[in-house]
């Protein structure tokens, strides 16, 4: 029996769904190029054969450096079908980091988006990079193959031997390495995690257990393809379920695309959901008193009903009647901004604030939160019929979870990675006796739903010995319209302070006073030793370019503190304040 690999999942779907649409790539001219499932499979076969023709063998690393687009998917599946190790690189990193990651992957070939990107990488990395096999997904350049030319080479191989592809793919085993994931570096130095075909297919097979999606549904891909959430949930699981994927042309065009495509499934990081919320509340703030009262009254009613349903309690008929009115007058218009057809709205890649989750539940579009990581795959998800706000859900089939004595979440699962590429010491630190030590501090409720309360490495211990988890407190600011980001400070210090960035759309003459009120509101929900005593508003937002954010917009706490060390010092001069 042939090994079950990522390619065999595509092969099964091509047989099942045939000419049905699989991928929709924008042409830049207001139209889309559509690939059917059979065309998707054919492209993967041709690319695999083409890679062999240019000397790329089983076990060789092939890097992918591109924004998320259909050609990335084709190249990825072709590389995997060839038995190559596919290493996706973040395009948003500084050039020097991109070059370092490319070299660390030991790639022999690079699929790259366009000539400009290729020239920039070679310029940053020097002549040695020019010796790699460069394959352009779009455009043409001297010293590089185009994707079309590679596919032509593959077709020639198939013309010469009709079973050329079958011979190539027969070499691939389920236990063979399939992908290298670059960790985000949010909690340490970036590393590359090696994941096998068996681990990926195990994760793919979990999809139908939690997502009731069919070929009549659709989704939009816009997250970085180097991120595990995008790779598993929006690239690989759709293959198993026959789900068509539409690709966003750019983040700037995403709001328009949402209304035009009207997806039924959307995965986005909390930052996207926060921005939608902030834009709605900023707009409401500018309206008259009656409109504001209607909006906040409707949200309050929706939140009350959502809470009753979450707790399994009956909802009075009178409230259900009012909710229908609120939905028609208020909530349906908010959902229309996102196309109006979303059945499953998922949040991933970073923790979601409980208050933000309650807002979306109130408007009839509950955010389903899950949990995954480079080293473990996607292992938890909220049941669609009974999600719990603030929880990452329950374990997926085949996954075991337990807590260490200090509350660290441990995972045993067929989806676990094999280890960090070329770093056995780092691997041994996180994989012990078949269990993955995640570094996340967690709790279980009575129904075995999981709640992440913080990162082990981010724990703040004050000079008085009090333990504070900053992530839990920072999440409380997510529904404050004036606040963009908050980073807490206080490790080995006498009290807690914060660096704050504000929402540009909400800035007024009274911004500092508004921030002070927001801090006071959050402080009322905290123990005295957790309360923020001083804060400083930064003149700019955190950025990927300055190393303060990961590509999925998670804050790199240590880099933020390093970049603003003078301000941090000022926060601990003079007398302690209260907010």
Segments from the language model and where they lie:
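Conserved AMP-binding/adenylate-forming
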Residues: 266, 306, 326-450, 456-459, ...
């Amino acid at each position: 029996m042939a090994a079950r690999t990522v390619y065999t999942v595509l092969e099964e779907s091509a047989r099942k769904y045939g000419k049905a649409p699989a991928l929709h790539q924008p042409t830049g001219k207001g139209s889309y190029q559509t690939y059917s499932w059979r065309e998707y499979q054919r492209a993967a076969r041709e690319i695999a054969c083409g890679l062999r023709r240019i000397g790329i063998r089983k076990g060789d690393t092939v890097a992918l450096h591109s924004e998320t687009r259909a050609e990335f998917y084709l190249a990825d599946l072709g590389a995997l079908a060839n038995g190559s190790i596919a290493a996706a690189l973040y395009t948003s990193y500084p050039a020097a980091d991109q070059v370092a990651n490319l070299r660390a992957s030991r790639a022999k070939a690079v699929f790259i988006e366009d000539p400009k990107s290729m020239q920039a990488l070679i310029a940053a990395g020097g002549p040695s990079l020019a010796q790699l096999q460069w394959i352009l997904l779009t455009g043409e350049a001297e010293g590089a193959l185009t994707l079309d030319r590679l596919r032509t080479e593959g077709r020639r191989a198939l013309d010469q031997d009709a079973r050329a592809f079958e011979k190539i793919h027969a070499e691939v085993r389920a236990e063979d390495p399939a992908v290298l994931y670059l960790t985000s570096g949010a909690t340490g130095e970036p590393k590359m995690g090696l994941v096998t075909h068996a681990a990926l297919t195990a994760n793919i097979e979990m999809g139908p257990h939690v997502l009731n999606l069919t070929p009549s549904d659709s989704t939009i891909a816009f997250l970085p393809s180097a991120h595990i959430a995008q790779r598993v949930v929006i690239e690989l699981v759709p293959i198993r379920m026959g789900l068509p994927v539409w690709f966003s042309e750019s983040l700037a065009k995403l709001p328009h695309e949402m209304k035009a495509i009207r997806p039924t499934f959307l995965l986005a990081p909390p930052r996207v959901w926060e921005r939608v919320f902030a834009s709605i509340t900023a707009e409401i703030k500018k309206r008259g008193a009656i409109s504001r009262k209607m909006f906040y009254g409707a949200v309050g009613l929706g939140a009350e009903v959502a809470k009753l349903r979450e707790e399994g309690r009956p909802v009075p008929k009178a409230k259900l009647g009012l909710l229908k009115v609120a939905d028609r007058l208020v909530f349906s218009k908010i959902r229309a901004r996102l196309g109006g057809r979303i059945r499953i709205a998922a949040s991933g890649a970073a923790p979601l604030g409980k208050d933000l989750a309650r807002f979306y539940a109130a408007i009839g579009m509950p955010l389903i939160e899950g949990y995954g990581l480079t080293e473990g795959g996607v292992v938890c998800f909220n049941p669609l019929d009974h999600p719990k706000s603030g929880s990452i859900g329950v374990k997926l089939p085949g996954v075991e979870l337990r807590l260490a004595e200090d509350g660290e979440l441990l995972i045993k699962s067929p989806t676990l990675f094999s280890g960090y590429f070329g770093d056995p010491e780092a691997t041994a630190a996180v994989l012990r006796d078949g269990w993955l030590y995640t570094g996340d501090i967690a709790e279980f409720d009575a129904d075995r739903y999981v709640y992440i309360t913080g990162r082990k490495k981010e724990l703040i211990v004050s000079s008085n010995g009090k333990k504070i988890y900053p992530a839990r407190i920072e999440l409380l600011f997510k529904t404050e319209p004036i606040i963009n980001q908050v980073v807490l400070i206080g490790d080995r210090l006498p009290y807690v302070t914060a660096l704050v960035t504000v929402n540009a759309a909400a800035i007024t003459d009274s911004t500092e006073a508004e921030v002070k009120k927001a801090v006071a509101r959050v402080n009322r929900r905290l123990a005295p030793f957790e309360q923020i005593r001083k804060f400083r508003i930064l003149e700019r937002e955190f950025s990927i370019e300055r190393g303060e954010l990961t590509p999925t917009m998670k804050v790199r706490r240590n880099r933020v503190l390093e970049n603003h060390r003078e301000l941090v010092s000022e926060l601990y001069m003079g007398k302690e304040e209260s907010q």
